[in-house]
A protein has these predicted regions:
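A sequence/structural signal for flexible, mid-protein segments enriched
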Residues: 1-184
Length: 184
């Protein structure tokens, strides 16, 4: 999938804030799986909420035929991270001078499954709810150790096509936000 644009938009909270989203149309043909990565100011985002995956632009589950449409808002806007200060006040996700680079990786359905299972293993709420959670375990892999079967392997091998595009929140981008009234 090719990214058409990465845009900054006027945020709602806090006042005067900026959010971001990318625009891309999902490839023709059902069952396409994607992994979206983002880099803010050149740094790969690796938090729990940064494992962004979807099938067919996020508009379908496996088996449904929804094809060739733009990525849905929850997917294309997931590159905006919300945070708060020590007093609980929301901070603007982006400030003037920030850059955002987005990559779309076309992955196999097996890699999609691996990423989602990994996210479940990583995102553990703790406390009483752990009694009812899926037990911790290594996520099944497609890697195999041939010389020492006692050596555990974690990870997943996948080759994919990748397309990336970025933007910087500079004076020109702020003018475009105002000119085109870009909002969420």
């Amino acid at each position: 999938s090719v990214i058409d644009s990465v845009n900054f938009v006027r945020g709602q909270v806090p006042e005067g804030s900026f959010y971001a989203e990318f625009w891309s149309r999902e490839e023709e043909g059902p069952g396409d799986a994607y992994w979206i990565k983002s880099y803010i100011n050149g740094e790969l985002q690796t938090g729990l909420q940064d494992i962004i995956t979807c099938i067919d632009a996020g508009a379908s589950s496996e088996g449904a035929i929804i094809d060739g449409i733009p990525f849905i808002p929850p997917i294309r806007r997931a590159v905006t991270k919300f945070d708060s200060d020590d007093d609980g006040n929301f901070l603007s996700p982006f400030v003037k001078g920030d850059s955002l680079y987005v990559e779309i990786h076309s992955v196999s359905l097996e890699a999609f499954d691996f990423l989602n299972k990994t996210a479940i293993q990583i995102n553990r709420p703790g406390g009483f709810s752990e009694l009812f959670a899926v037990s911790l375990s290594n996520v099944p892999t497609n890697l195999l150790v041939t010389n020492d079967q006692n050596y555990p392997v974690v990870g997943f091998f996948n080759v994919s096509s990748v397309h990336g595009l970025g933007n910087t929140l500079d004076d020109d981008e702020i003018r475009k936000i105002e000119l085109y009234n870009r909002e969420w």
